[in-house]
């Protein structure tokens, strides 16, 4: 389940007890992985959800929203990954919601996260700018543990890279 941290699945902040109850009920009814993010990359807004997922016996994937600006550097993303891992995240996910992360940045970021952390690193991108498959190949070369793909009717464009294309690329 994609969980917006303190916003749960909406666009307003909820009290900790509401977040905890929502996660507990979701886990009770079969959700076993929570991919938890905050739209402004503030780990404080993810802490309650991570703690609640762990308490419910589910996996908590701490998610870094990839963006570009003078303050969004590889080091700031690694620092955030470390903070999420320290909160108990079972994995770190690089979430490139706009499909703009270039392959060379992917290589650098995945390598840095893998070097600094002892938990799996995943990547999620969209093929919006046509970079998805090459971004995933760079991530794989850097040691990423998992990539999100999509079946062909829903793939590419604003979707994730096509699973069949990735399979063909990886099988050489």
Task: State what each model feature region is.
Residues 1-35, 39-172:
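Catalytic cores and adjacent flexible loops of soluble metabolic enzymes
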């Amino acid at each position: 389940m994609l969980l917006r941290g303190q916003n749960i699945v909406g666009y307003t902040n909820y009290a900790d007890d509401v977040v905890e109850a929502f996660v507990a009920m979701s886990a009770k009814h079969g959700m076993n992985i929570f991919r938890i993010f905050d739209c402004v990359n503030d780990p404080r807004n993810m802490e309650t959800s991570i703690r609640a997922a762990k308490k419910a016996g589910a996996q908590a994937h701490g998610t870094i929203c990839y963006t570009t600006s003078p303050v969004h550097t590889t080091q700031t993303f690694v620092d955030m990954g470390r903070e999420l891992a320290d909160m108990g995240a079972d994995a770190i996910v690089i979430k490139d919601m706009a499909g703009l992360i270039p392959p060379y940045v992917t290589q650098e970021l995945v390598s840095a996260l893998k070097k600094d952390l002892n938990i799996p690193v995943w990547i999620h991108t969209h093929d919006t700018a046509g970079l998805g498959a090459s971004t995933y190949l760079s991530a794989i070369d850097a040691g990423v543990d998992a990539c999100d793909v999509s079946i062909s009717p829903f793939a590419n464009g604003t979707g994730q890279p096509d699973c069949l294309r990735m399979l063909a690329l990886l099988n050489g």
